Amino acid sequence: MEFFKYIFYGIIQGLTEFIPISSTAHLKIISLLFGMDDPGSSVSAIIQIGSVFAIFWYFRKSISNYKNTNSRKPSYSFLFNKLNKSIFIGTIPIVFIGVIIKLFVPGFSDSFLRSNLSIALVSILMSLIMLFADISTKKSINLNNHKYPNNLYIGIAQAFAIVPGVSRSGATISMALLSGWNRKDAAKFSFLLGIPSISLAAFVEFFSAVNQFSTFPFLPLFAGLITAFFSSLLAINFLIKYVSSHGLKIFVYYRLIFGILILFNL
């Protein structure tokens, strides 16, 4: 039973990490619906490593050999090309906020912000923000012509995803659209921006839970990580294709209904 529970966690994590509906909220709420314990931030973060591997695999060519088409000199440097500089800039806000929370708000993971009421209210608020972003985009900015300040704004939006229910992909795609990005590249950059942020979260939680290692079911946890990898690949492929042609409205409606249902069942 324990084995299948973590496979279930992996499926939910992988699908909802990239579909803009909040993986943390769905892991918590769906687990409760099926009579299972909230996996908690440590387990969630470790399973998220599978999602990081999925991003690396899906975008492996973009990460290692990205070229700025506006330049006559193609960039072959992994560390210093424009895309990776953009990811670095976009990661700064969540690192800054994460360090502050870790040092000065030790009870954050058990605070009101992880409660069902907070998740419901945040989900409803995010549905409205996503709707406004979807109808406001100018579609003029892409991965080749974006400016570094855009990356910082998107990174600030990502930092808000520390709050359960926000959705990292929902916040970053919305901010990218509000900044004038086209939908397809907004989704791509959102996923690439997740590599350092998700990795850092997993790293911090992994070492924070070092004293609990003896109680961790490693084989089921590994199964959840592998499941998250494959379900993440499906979610990434689906969302890029879907958002490019249909936008975010279906997720807006889903998040609105999701939040209202939680409110009525508190």
From Swiss-Prot:
Signal peptide: none annotated. Bacitracin is thought to be involved in the inhibition of peptidoglycan synthesis by sequestering undecaprenyl diphosphate, thereby reducing the pool of lipid carrier available. This is Undecaprenyl-diphosphatase. One of its GO terms (molecular function) is undecaprenyl-diphosphatase activity. It catalyses: di-trans,octa-cis-undecaprenyl diphosphate + H2O = di-trans,octa-cis-undecaprenyl phosphate + phosphate + H(+). It is a multi-pass membrane protein. Its main location: membrane. Keywords: Antibiotic resistance, Cell inner membrane, Cell membrane, Cell shape, Cell wall biogenesis/degradation, Hydrolase, Membrane, Peptidoglycan synthesis, Transmembrane, Transmembrane helix. It is found in: Cell inner membrane. Its EC number is 3.6.1.27. It comes from Prochlorococcus marinus subsp. pastoris (strain CCMP1986 / NIES-2087 / MED4). InterPro entries: UppP.
